[in-house]
């Protein structure tokens, strides 16, 4: 869904931690981040600590915050939950927090993605193949 939105001109920004908690999962994350970059989205690596938040903000009107990774595994197998917030003030505050966090992040560019090492590419592809199990 994020790739489709980015390809249609929606401003899609993804923030991931710069330090992995699990290397295998992080490799899969970088692979999927590359797909978003190719679709026209932007990816940032948060440098000021470990970022584990899962939040989505849309149009300054709606926000989704919680523990789920926004995938079927999180919702069906792990029984994680998110809160849908239909409050403009809260959605705008969350967007403002995200924009402040960008200042503590580095942009991960399409050029960086395309110029990664062969070893990194292999790790990402193997991790991506197994990502439904992660």
Language-model features: where?
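PLD/PLD-like phosphodiesterase catalytic module centered on the HKD motif
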Residues: 1-134
């Amino acid at each position: 869904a994020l790739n489709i939105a980015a390809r249609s001109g929606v401003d899609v920004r993804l923030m991931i931690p710069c330090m992995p908690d699990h290397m295998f999962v992080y490799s899969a994350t970088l692979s999927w981040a590359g797909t978003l970059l190719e679709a026209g989205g932007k990816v940032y690596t948060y440098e000021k600590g470990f970022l584990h938040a899962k939040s989505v903000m849309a149009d300054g009107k709606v926000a989704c915050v919680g523990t789920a990774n926004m995938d079927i595994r999180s919702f069906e197998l792990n029984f994680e939950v998110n809160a849908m917030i239909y409050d403009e003030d809260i959605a705008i505050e969350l967007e403002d927090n995200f924009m402040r966090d960008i200042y503590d992040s580095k942009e991960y560019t399409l050029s960086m993605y395309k110029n990664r090492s062969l070893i990194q590419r292999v790790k990402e592809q193997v991790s991506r193949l197994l990502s439904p199990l992660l």
